[in-house]
C-alpha cells in the first residue's frame, strides 16, 4: 500500500506512474500481474523474499509486492484464495493438521525445499552454563534454584523464559507446564526486541534463557548454546499437529519448505517455475544475516549484494 501513499506526499509527482516505477528494479513490466510474496517476522524470511523480488523484477519483469503476514492461518488462507502468491520459508514443525489440509486439497502447492535447515530451541549464553552446568539439560530447569536464577521483577517467584513474537510457532508454555518447570513465558514482541534484551543481559553477564533458532547471526555473536530438552517423539509431533496441549519435548530439526497458491502456476508460470527452483541454503542465509540482523543494513541492499555475488547460482533458477 505504501506506493499509493507516496504521490500524495509529493504533489508534483504523477500518482498513476509511481507504483509501476517503484525504486526497485529497472525493466519491470507494469502490464504483468503483481506477484505477492509473503514475508514472516524474522530476518531470514525477509532476506529470502528480497532475493526473490530482486531477481523476479530484474529478470522476469513482474512487479513484486511484499506482504507481511504474522499468522500461519492468514498465510494459508491467503494463498488458498489467490490473494497471496507464495511463501519461501515455512517451518514444517509449526504446521497444524488443519493447515496441511490446504496442501491435500491443492489450493496451496508445496513447491519444494528452500535449501536451509532450521532448528528452534531453548538457548542460553555459554557463561550461564559455565556457572551452572546443570542447565545444559532440561532437568536443571525443574529445580527451584533455576527459578531464582532466571527470575525477574515481573516473573515473581517464577523464572522468566524469554520468548519472542507471539505469532511464532512455539510450544514453550506447554513444555514448561508438562515438564513441571517453575517458569513463565514472557514475550519480547519481536526478534529485534529479543536481540536488544539478549545484548543487555550479555553485556551485564546476567542469566537469560530464551526461545531462539538457527540459522541466525546471534548464535555466534552471543555464544548461545542450545539446552537439551527431551528427545522428539512421534507422540510429541502428533500433539503439535493436533494442537492438543500435550507437547513436552524438544523442537525437531526443520527442513524448511516453500509453498505457493494453487493459482500461481496459471497466473505466472515462469514465476512459478522460478520459485520451484529457488534455493537458499543455510550457508547463504548465514552469509547475509549478520549485515541485516546485527548491523541493521537495509535487507534489500543485503539481498542485492548477495545477488551480485552469486549470479552463477541464481541464473540456474531461471533456466
Regions found by a protein language model. Give the residues of each.
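Immediate post-signal peptide segment of exported/extracytoplasmic ligand-binding proteins
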Residues: 2-36, 150-158, 312-319
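Short, polar/charged alpha-helical segment
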Residues: 22-26, 43-62, 174-176
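Short, well-ordered beta-strand elements
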Residues: 29-44, 62-68, 158-162, 275
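An extracytoplasmic/periplasmic, membrane-proximal ligand-sensing/linker region
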Residues: 32, 44, 168-184, 188-205, ...
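N-terminal segment of the mature folded domain
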Residues: 72-127
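A conserved helix-loop-strand patch within extracytoplasmic ligand-binding domains
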Residues: 107-161
